[in-house]
Curated annotation (Swiss-Prot):
This is Putative membrane protein insertion efficiency factor. InterPro entries: Membr_insert_effic_factor_YidD. It comes from Thermobifida fusca (strain YX). Pfam families: YidD. HAMAP family: UPF0161_YidD (MF_00386).
Length: 105
């Protein structure tokens, strides 16, 4: 679900997040109430959606990070095209299931 390569601005925004993940986050116990963690969510959102929408999704996610929110599974939404339908990078039959008409499966 990621773009072939994040935009330049998205890569610039990812750098400080990676720095936080590498040097600051290990100093503290894991306390994130979400999966994936907020920093991992931010990196994935920027890669999948680019700088504009990825930053917006990250800000929304950080806004939910408080003691009164239950947390839990909160994946990055899939990328959509101009008509609003999901863009899938998967090819038919690549999910491990046999495709219709596959002999012997």
């Amino acid at each position: 679900m990621t773009r072939d390569r994040p935009t330049l601005l998205a890569r610039v925004l990812i750098l400080p997040i990676r720095g936080y993940q590498r040097w600051i986050s290990p100093l503290f116990p894991p306390v994130c109430r979400f999966y994936p963690s907020c920093s991992s969510y931010a990196v994935e959102a920027l890669r999948v959606h680019g700088a504009g929408r990825g930053l917006w999704l990250t800000i929304r996610r950080l806004g939910k990070c408080h003691p009164f929110h239950p947390g839990g599974l909160d994946p990055v939404p899939p990328r959509r095209n101009e008509s609003g339908t999901e863009i899938s990078d998967a090819r038919p039959g690549s999910d491990g299931e046999a495709s219709p008409g596959a002999p012997g499966l």
